C-alpha cells in the first residue's frame, strides 16, 4: 500500500481498476477526445484522472454541485447535465463512456466522431447497451462495447506511483460502520453519492 495512504483510501482503488480496464479496452491515447458521463461516481472520478494522465482531452458530465470537483480532478471541460443537454455541447469525441449505466448509444451517437466508440460500464436502460455491444461484436464494428474488467500487469504499481505523487486522488463521499450497511446502500441508491461510499468494518 502506498506510503501515507489510509486503508479507506486504498479501498477505493476498485473504481480505478475498472476505469483503467475501460480505457485500455478503448485504446485511449494522447490527444484523443473523451466524454465521460457520470464523472462524479466511483468509476467516473477515477476515469477522469486516468484519462487526463494519458494525455487525453477530457469532458466530464456531472451535476451542478460536482462541476468544481470535475475541474479539480483535471477535466478540461465540465458540463452540467441538470442545466443543459450534454449531447449538444458542440463537439464530437473519439470516445463517449457511460460510467453509471444511465444513458445509451442511441442517445449519445451524435457526439461521436466517425469511427468513434461508445463504451458502457453497465447494461444501460432496458439492457440496450448489452444488445448493441453483442451486435457490434458480431459485425466487428466495435461501435458499442461493455469492457469486462481483467487483470492488467503493472497496474497496481502504476496506481501506487500516481497516488504517492499526488496525481491520483481517492474521492470518498461517506463512511458507514458495518452495522449501518443498509443505510449506506440506501444512500447509494439515491444516485447522489460522489466518488465512493466506504463501509468501515473495523469501526465495529
Please identify what each model-predicted range represents:
Residues 77-82, 176-179:
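Short acidic-hydrophobic, aromatic-tinged amphipathic segments that line or gate anion-handling sites
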